[in-house]
Structure formats: structure tokens, C-alpha cells
Amino acid sequence: MKQYLDLIKKIIKNGNSKKDRTGTGTLSIFGHHMKFDLKKGFPLITTKKCHIPSIIHELLWFLRGETNIKYLNENKISIWDNWADKFGDLGPIYGKQWRSWDTSNGKKIDQIKNVLKQIKEDPDSRRILVSSWNVGEIDKMSLAPCHILFQFYVLKKKLSCQLYQRSCDVFLGLPFNIASYAILIHMIAQQCNLQVGEFLWTGGDVHLYKNHVELAKKQILRIPKKLPELIILKKPQSLFQYSFEDFKIVGYKPYSLIKGKISV
């Protein structure tokens, strides 16, 4: 994925030194856009190894509407452990907002079910979107959502999606985010009897943490390999009935892992 490496190079060359919530410090740019044609391969970076189970299980966890790390830990996934309280709770983060957004009149909105209904019944709608940025509950979340809004677009029986990410950890987080939403597009396309189209990614504060810069410089020396292919082995009756075993990624031959420290 040359686009990803080009972004790293851009930040290293033009990034602004900024302070951040974690105290680590970043090199940051404001505003960046990338587009991935999902027909040309599954957009999982090859210039370092990514932990595929973490990507898939996290997405399934979001879709379950869960906000406790119990499911993740049962599947040996620890990517949210640093933000959980002693009971494993994270507050009303992504899963809660996707599946059970609280309204002022006491009702709950399942944004994912609404999206599925709209794609099937009104595919030309300009309102097929999901928001995680619930202003009234941000302070209750252990971590404010980074990828905050995604919108679907149907054209000629192909499903595309654009994501807006307000804050992006390019070295550790972005490869996961791109792959996760690509999987989601494949899942929803399958459920709605559509083909996959494009994934468009737009970032706000797009940054490298300063303790990742030298690691990123090592990564950009690697030449990207052919993208793998995502295969969904069966079609469940519902978007919410997929399991980890339903996904197979073929032809993924990445370079070795480059491990970076996460900033909490």
C-alpha cells in the first residue's frame, strides 16, 4: 500500500511538532485523504505484519454493541486493556453508539440496523451514515472515539464507504482502521447482495507519535508486496451472526513485525 507509506513520508517531511493528551508528542499534519479500490485487493499493509485476529475480533465486538473487554480477552485480544476500568468497562464507546444510541426521549437507536435497512430500501439516500461522536456522552467514555463518522454510497450495485477520522495514530492505529472498515464493507455488501466498491479515508489530525518516527523510517524502506484477498466463507442470516472463523485472508505475506509502544 504505497498510499500509506507516502503518508508516513509526508508527515516525516512536513509534520508539525505538537503536544498531545498522552504527553508523548507528535509530528502532525491536518487533513489527508486516501482511496482504496476493494476490488483490487484487501487493504492490509504488507510492510509490517498486522495482527489479523485483533482487527476481526474488535470489529465483531463493535457490532455486538459491547463496551466491556470480556469478549476481547476471552479471544486473547488485549488492544483495549489500557483504557478499561477494573471491571473491564470502557464507558459508552463505539459499540454503544453504533447499536444503542440514547435519545433525549429515552429511546435507543440502532444505527447499524438503520444503515442496513436504508441500503436495501433507499440506496440513493444521502443519510446512510453512522456517528460515534455522541457529544453528550464523550466525558463518560474511557477514550473519545477517533474514527467518528462513516457514510455509505451505493452505485451500480457496488457499496462504497467514506470514513472521517478526527485523530489518527498513523503507525499503530491506521493499518487496523483501514482493514477493519474494509471488512465491514465486505460484510454489509454481502448482506445487501451488493459488490464491494471503494473505501475512502479522510483524516483530521493525522500524526506520528515521536517515539514511532524512527520505526516509521524503517518501515518506509520496505517495498510493498501484493495485497492479500479477503474471503468470507459463508453468509449468515444477519450481519450480527458472523464469527471469527467466517473470515479468511489469503496471500498475506508481510514483512516482519515492527513493534511500537502505544501512547495511553
Curated annotation (Swiss-Prot):
It is found in: Cytoplasm. Pfam families: Thymidylat_synt. It catalyses: dUMP + (6R)-5,10-methylene-5,6,7,8-tetrahydrofolate = 7,8-dihydrofolate + dTMP. It comes from the Bacteria. GO terms for molecular function: thymidylate synthase activity. Keywords: Cytoplasm, Methyltransferase, Nucleotide biosynthesis, Transferase. DUMP binds at R21, R126, R127, R166, S167, C168, D169, N177, H207, L208, Y209. Pathway: Pyrimidine metabolism; dTTP biosynthesis. Transmembrane segments: none annotated. (6R)-5,10-methylene-5,6,7,8-tetrahydrofolate binds at H51, D169, S263. GO terms for cellular component: cytosol. GO terms for biological process: dTMP biosynthetic process; dTTP biosynthetic process; methylation. The active site is at C146. Its EC number is 2.1.1.45. Homodimer. Belongs to the thymidylate synthase family. Bacterial-type ThyA subfamily. Catalyzes the reductive methylation of 2'-deoxyuridine-5'-monophosphate (dUMP) to 2'-deoxythymidine-5'-monophosphate (dTMP) while utilizing 5,10-methylenetetrahydrofolate (mTHF) as the methyl donor and reductant in the reaction, yielding dihydrofolate (DHF) as a by-product. This enzymatic reaction provides an intracellular de novo source of dTMP, an essential precursor for DNA biosynthesis. This is Thymidylate synthase. The gene is thyA.
